[in-house]
Amino acid sequence: MGKKNKSNGGGNTNNTPTKTPSKPPVKFNDKWASIENGEAKSASVSHYKEPSKEPKFVHPAKLAKEKKIFDGLDIPERVLAHGKVVEQNGGKKRRHREISPKMEAKKPKVESKSKDGVAAKKAHKHFTVSSEVVQSTYFFEEPDNGNEVTLVSNGKETTIEKTVILDEEVEDEEIDEEEFEDEEEVEDEEGMDEDETEIDESEMIVDPKDIERCIEFEDVDDEDEMEDEEEFEDEEEVEDEEVDDEEEEEVADEERGEEQEDEQEEEEEVSDEESVVSEMDADSDDEGFIAGKDREAHVISKDKAARTFAAKPVDFDAFPFNDQDSVVTASRAFGFMVSPCDVQTFFDKFYQSNVLVVHRKTPAYYGNLFSTTRFSELLEKHYLEYNMNINIAQYKDGIRTTLNGKGRVYPQIVKQHLHNLCSVQLVNPQTFDDRIWYLCEILQEQFGCFVGANTYLTPAGSSGFAPHWDEIDAFLLQVEGRKYWRVWAPESAEEELPLESSGNFTEDDMKGKEPVFEGWIEQGDMIYIPRGYTHQARTDKKVHSLHVTVSTGRQWSFANLMEKVIPEAVGALTEERHKLRRGLPIGLFDMGGVVDLDYSQEEHFTEKFKIVVDRHMSRLRNLVADHLLDSSVDSMTKEFMKQALPPILTDKEKKRSVIGLSTNLLGDDLIDFCANTKVKFIRKHTQRLLMESEDSCFISHRMNNSRLFEGRPETLVDFPSTGIDTYRVLWNAYPEWRTLDEIFSCRETKSNTRKEKLAAIQILFQMGVLLVKNPK
């Protein structure tokens, strides 16, 4: 509610008509009297340029407020670790709105009464004030005539008749409510476009005591204004006209200062925005989630699939998907696996969201990828152990049983288990079988993470595993026989995309749950089961089943990235920010806890603990977002280099690399690094250049990795900083070859000597990531 005008010519305070004196007495600092004497100043000058000379009344409620330490608006810049200083714009919370010459000053909305007696809206209380005197607009009452008011707008005076209409205090029973509402709508529309509709000054009727002038701020919340008005509602009756906008601005500044302590570098706008974003993100977690049976698996029929398949079976010994670009190779292999669904459609429609089933009319579609015969050969030739390489399982009468022995697994023992209707799982076939190694290794370039495999041999009329979900995305390739599958979608957002596999469910657990897919997967077919989908299968009573599961995405999520980034960020912020190293507040144990107790210092919980923690978290978030996202990508890439399968090389690649092929150790055919020697990386993602500091770097690569998951320590090789430009040229040129002359003479490497460039090339070759082709 606006403040009442207490000027000597402005009427009484109880809003009842009185007789106007012929000439009001002039008091000290009477600004309305100065108009009469010809000494009038604009409203912006008189109310905002000159402070009051009379003592101001301060309400006791204001005196009881805690004093602020600072207002938080003097922050010149924000300093963060691991990056340059970022200058701030000083904030916008109390920025005065300036009116340019091209912008017309806002006209006040006032009460008016038309000739037909219909009242318009109540007077608007907030106006935009220009710093320019010529654009000021104000009203004053004629001292000799209490029934007239003079409007002064840009130096032009207009005398109009006064009709007193009070805010929310007078109801005109003669006014028709429908006409009043219609008039409001019309004036609202007119007020929205001031350029189209001009206010008729002759119809403007207003009482000066109903006018309140205030500065319009861009970012002051309505809630803060309501608090100001409620706080000074009682003050209005005793306060004179000098309680103006300068005092209101001071009160508003104090309220903002209460939410800050001694953090002059903190921007409250940023933290407020982050809170809103966080709440919106939390609210959107469940948005769009489709539970359980409402999801639909997409099934591609045999008739549709038959038109896309080549008649000739694939020979995995011949590296069928190879291209000079390893990323293209990966895309070809993945396209073969999910065909006839194209790669982009799969990632748009199915990846980590829906089941995809592909039925094919070609039983030999997967060629010589894997077979029961090949499994027997691996058992005979390799030392495969229980638990590490082989699991024996049986699911009977709703109970899953593991029947693993100890030591090496022999073919004859496996045969006995199969005869007893047990399922045999080969945990890591890529370690022993080159064909599965080839498929998994090249798919790593597609997914950017470790890709592994399992094989499951299950005799006819049996089942080896109870219903469960896995922590990986699974592509099940049916290479022999057939299997009957049931797949259930997650029933809540909490079950979506788990990072750990589930335990075994019973048949009772699955009762009442409708699967999204239930049916046979035949030889040559494929089914994709997203992470977190519960599944269970059984074989035909007359036919055994052998399928290869290609798995990806294990522990490769945003959560895993955050687990790496946050500790690094906390360490970096702790080094830079001494306030993060301060001790916890005294009496913290008595401020709060999970259990609802009568904590003696609970009133200090927000001020001493919560606000401080929120401030540190805001700085932590800014540090991660502004300076650690790039390094987080490097961290995950380094993790990939440690876990990933090594590349499987063709004979030609072996011959051109440091590995060699049928190398004559006593021969004279040495690899020569001359001007016409051509070089390129073996794969796009076999190596990664990482920065340890501004002038120190190293390379992490997977050339020497074990085919057993993390079977060897990661390989890290120091790399000279003078070779960074050479590395960059090779990276940008991939998959094309570049001669040494092209590398040495290009603009990117001109800052390095020829010796430094050659040294970088030789280091890359010696660590095994470079292919070299000598001129003939």
Swiss-Prot record:
Could you tell me what reaction this enzyme catalyses?
N(6),N(6)-dimethyl-L-lysyl(36)-[histone H3] + 2 2-oxoglutarate + 2 O2 = L-lysyl(36)-[histone H3] + 2 formaldehyde + 2 succinate + 2 CO2
Q: Short name of one Pfam family for this protein?
A: RIOX1_C_WH
Q: Which domain of life is it from?
A: Eukaryota
Main localization, broad class: nucleus
Regions of biased composition (Basic and acidic residues) lie at: 47-57, 98-119, 206-216
- Cofactor: binding comment: Binds 1 Fe(2+) ion per subunit.
Domain JmjC: from-to ranges: 425-569
EC nos: 1.14.11.-, 1.14.11.27
Keyword annotations from UniProtKB, A to Z: Chromatin regulator, Dioxygenase, Iron, Metal-binding, Nucleus, Oxidoreductase, Repressor, Transcription, Transcription regulation
Kindly give the InterPro entries that the UniProt entry links to this protein.
JmjC_dom, NO66-like, RIOX1/NO66-like_C_WH
* Span list, region Disordered: 1-57, 87-126, 165-288
Where is Fe cation annotated to bind?
H468, D470, H535
List, alphabetically, the SUPFAM superfamilies matched.
Answer: Clavaminate synthase-like
Enumerate the cofactors the protein uses. Answer: Fe(2+)
Question: According to the UniProt entry, which residue ranges have a biased composition of type Acidic residues?
Answer: 166-204, 217-288
Q: Name one GO cellular component term.
A: nucleolus
The cellular location(s) given in this protein's UniProt record come to: Nucleus
| PROSITE patterns reported for this sequence | JMJC
What is the similarity comment for this entry?
Belongs to the ROX family. NO66 subfamily.
Explain the purpose of this protein: Oxygenase that can act as both a histone lysine demethylase and a ribosomal histidine hydroxylase. Specifically demethylates 'Lys-4' (H3K4me) and 'Lys-36' (H3K36me) of histone H3, thereby playing a central role in histone code.
Instruction: Spell out the protein name for this chain.
Output: Bifunctional lysine-specific demethylase and histidyl-hydroxylase NO66
Query: Corresponding gene?
Result: jmjc-1
